[in-house]
Amino acid sequence: MVDIVDKALRMGEGHQLKKLENVAKAVNALEDEISALSDEDLKAQTPKFKQEIENGKSLDEIMPEAFATVREVSKRTLGQRHFDVQLMGGAALHWGNIAEMKTGEGKTLVATLPTYLNALEGKGVHVVTVNDYLASYQSELMGRIYRFLGMNVGCIITEQKPPERRKQYNADITYGTNNEFGFDYLRDNMAWEKADLVQRGHHYAIVDEVDSILIDEARTPLIISGPAEGDVTRWYRQFAKLVLKLTRDEDYDVDEKKKVVGILDPGITKVEDFLGIDNLYEPANTALIGYLNNAIKAKELFLRDKDYVVTQGEVLIVDEHTGRILPGRRYNEGLHQAIEAKEGVEVKAENQTFATITLQNYFRMYDKLAGMTGTAETEAAEFMNTYKLGVLPIKTNKPMIRKDQDDLIYRTKKEKLAAIVKDVAKRHAEGQPVLLGTASVESSEVVSALLDVAKIPHQVLNAKQHEKEAAVVAVAGRKGAVTVATNMAGRGTDIMLGGNVEFLADAKLKSEGYSPEDTPEEYEKRWPGTLNEIKAQVKDEHEEVKELGGLYVLGTERHESRRIDNQLRGRSGRQGDPGESRFYLSLEDDLMRLFNTQLVAQVMARGMEEGQPIEAKSVTKGVRTAQKAVESRNYEIRKNVLKYDDVMNKQRTVIYSERQAVLKGEDIHKDILRFISDTVESYIKGANKGSEKPKDWDWEGLFKALNTVIPTKVDEDEVRKIVGGLKGAKAVEAVRDLIVEDARQQYGEMEETIGETGLRDLERRVVLAVLDRKWREHLYEMDYLKDGIGLRGMGQRDPLVEYQREGYQMYNSMIEAIKEETVQLLFHIDIKQVATTDDAVDEVEETAESADTIAVASGPDENGESVVEAAEGEVEEEDEDTDAKQAIAESAAASEAGESTLPVAGPAPVSHAEGKVPVSKRPKSEELKTPWADGRTFPGTGKNAPCPCGSGRKYKMCHGQNEA
């Protein structure tokens, strides 16, 4: 099916390429004219273009002259002239496409063309890279073009504070990583002051390594989280010890392909004995199952130096696609804590989601989106379906002459590694540079150790040595160089035969104390001479390495994705240089073992001798089949993630839009008055019990409940007399009007006390505080709903439709709760005892439980989803030798005493359903922990209805637990 879609997408490709060629011709026709301009005349082009846009000219009309201007400035500042194919790539990006350009074709330089053109509109252009280093490096190097033309260039990096970030976003052009852009969007929608906002819209973005960011990381929601209530870290330590006593295939099952585990009956018995409980599956022990599953996953599915590394007592995730460490990222739902417990490092507290968005929905917010990569064609259908992005392959400037050899397959990893070392030794002796690509940190260290034994000098580049990444890659093409690296996707620095001229020139100038930030004039002055000096040094070695066959890329195993393999291969053969590539495989490699058992069986049937490889087209084809199976599975996961996030995205868009309006000073006084009226009416309907006759209403309950929200001065007996002869809607309306009139009078007195401006500011703060808390609670409830929604399929119901329906109901309940709690807070602040408006605001903000956390997204779990947890503050160390049975006993004793120390699934959601007893005034957080400990039940209450005890929790999450 995907292949058919791919063919359909390619039907108009010839016409598109013709348009791109015409742009290149138009730019070339202007070259002599633009080249004749002085520096001052070139600088004057920018204000001229801006004026033309103001006068009504389109960017398309300006494009040829703007591109010609950028090309000329590039020649004068960088010594680089855009090739025709680069001009074509620039036009493709301007028109909102993905330009597929092979490695070494100068994608970074290509981006300067549409970036400058679109920045002329003054709305900001975002250039998205895969890491902070590339963002800084590209903004420095390419920034020389923009600054020459009078453009401001900004760069967003992790350590920056909000004022600095705002300055960078206000620049004409801003470089940064996908995570930084996404998290700044989320943080802007958590801000309490207009002055705290940093972004200024989403006009145009160019995404470098677009397949890595929009495909590989699309399964990864960006999530900002903060500490949840309660400390359950000891349970992770206990279960880390417990699973060491369990045996795989005897006590539990593991499915490595799907990344899931399952506890078996013998294992259940051992767990119950260890914990001293009768039944693991009793409702009171539900949370223990989660700790057990995570502990088994941490033991069996997440391996040190492959999926993560441990550095300075911290578990750091390794990006499966690039081999880079992902600082700040944490697996979700307790998995990261389970890994920390397994490794014996500090177990950090569990977190609660405050804000979240997928990369897919973040980048779909841009008015115009474009991307660059060397490997997008295999995912063309997904780019079009998800992002409405076409993929346009741009031909290489010079013909590709790299030799891609067929794969060699061995029986065992040991045989494969021996053959690899032998091959590398031969080529190193000849002086040919070699790049060995590995799939994990562990593999790179094994290969490095074998090269050490063989006395082959080499450099290692993996997640543990990422600081020296650019320096290592820049010299990987020199004569005799041997470089061992984890996945090369997105490394960003070209491997040039003889060495990377620009990098070496930049490094030389910086070593002499000159940089584009601190000494821009001296740096620019010395750049041409230094560049020519380095070029002369590199030229002879470049020719020598070409004679030796160019860069030899050796893949030590196939990756799940064909694109990652193609990116590794693409490091060789740039700009018409010679090169060669080959992959070495074994039947023990994960891809072969998990996804192509049929091929493994066929190879084994041949009766291979030890050390004897098979080299055949059928092997390469079989590997490709396995990769397609994995890619298809991952695509389905990404589609599923997007379908569910689209439900949240509609809600998030409305909530964030309303929040921004409040934050930016929109007058919400009329909204507050409406909230008062709606809340009062909701309470009246909840008290009438469906009866049209006021005499049957629960008047005592109505006024008791109402007074927890609005301390009304209306007399109950007087109201009953007035509405005595009315029925139905008229009775409801009459009662509502009486109470609302009284509430408005009280509210007017409040305004007289603190002034109109003071009350408007207070209203804004209260709405922000309540909206933020209710939105967080809603996110938790939606996660809870999604976790179990798949089971609806067993009842012949579409889980997605059910999620949409119930999510809509929960959203409406949240809106009602926001109205009610806003009114409640405003009427319960003692204005007379508040000296200033700021004091009142402080009182409100204390209820907001706001957090200032910076987090980034993590790799996918078995469902293809992941989150980020970034806990704020210190975590107290607990005694790791606490006996589990003692802990269970303590919990039971505490429960009898009216307390609870057993773990719970997470922070309890708070909601309000119309027509039920409304939420009472919110208790302090310590009172919320165990309201059901008194043992009461309320027969007849719906599981999802608010608990009648007034805690604000759903009944099933509160006193409903006592019915079990």
UniProtKB/Swiss-Prot annotation:
Q: How is the cofactor bound?
A: May bind 1 zinc ion per subunit.
Gene3D superfamilies for the chain = 3.10.450.50, Helical scaffold and wing domains of SecA (1.10.3060.10), P-loop containing nucleotide triphosphate hydrolases (3.40.50.300), SecA, preprotein cross-linking domain (3.90.1440.10)
One GO cellular component assignment for this chain's record is:
cytosol
Membrane topology per the entry is:
Peripheral membrane protein
Q: Which SMART domains match?
A: SecA_DEAD, SecA_PP_bind
Statement: the UniProt record of this protein carries the keyword Amino-acid biosynthesis: no
Task: Give the compositionally biased regions (Low complexity).
Answer: 887-900
Keywords from the UniProt entry: ATP-binding, Cell membrane, Cytoplasm, Membrane, Metal-binding, Nucleotide-binding, Protein transport, Translocase, Translocation, Transport, Zinc
Q: Which cofactor does it need?
A: Zn(2+)
Where ATP binds, per the record, is at Q86, G104, E105, G106, K107, T108, D494
- E.C. code: 7.4.2.8
Q: Which Pfam families match?
A: P-loop_SecA (PF21090), SEC-C (PF02810), SecA_DEAD (PF07517), SecA_PP_bind (PF01043), SecA_SW (PF07516)
Query: Which amino acid positions bind Zn(2+), per UniProt?
Result: C947, C949, C958, H959
Q: Which reaction does it catalyse?
A: ATP + H2O + cellular proteinSide 1 = ADP + phosphate + cellular proteinSide 2
Family matches, as InterPro entries: Helicase_ATP-bd (IPR014001), Helicase_C-like (IPR001650), P-loop_NTPase (IPR027417), SEC_C_motif (IPR004027), SecA (IPR000185), SecA_CS (IPR020937), SecA_DEAD (IPR011115), SecA_motor_DEAD (IPR014018)
**Where in the sequence does UniProt note compositional bias of the Acidic residues kind?**
871-882
The answer on whether this UniProt entry bears the keyword Transport reads yes
**Residue ranges of the region described as Disordered:** 846-964
Biological process terms in GO annotation: intracellular protein transmembrane transport; protein import; protein targeting; protein transport by the Sec complex
Q: Where in the cell is it found?
A: Cell membrane; Cytoplasm
Describe the function of this protein: Part of the Sec protein translocase complex. Interacts with the SecYEG preprotein conducting channel. Has a central role in coupling the hydrolysis of ATP to the transfer of proteins into and across the cell membrane, serving as an ATP-driven molecular motor driving the stepwise translocation of polypeptide chains across the membrane.
Family statement = Belongs to the SecA family.
Subunit info here reads:
Monomer and homodimer. Part of the essential Sec protein translocation apparatus which comprises SecA, SecYEG and auxiliary proteins SecDF. Other proteins may also be involved.
What is the name listed in the Swiss-Prot or TrEMBL entry for this protein?
Protein translocase subunit SecA
Q: Which gene encodes it?
A: secA
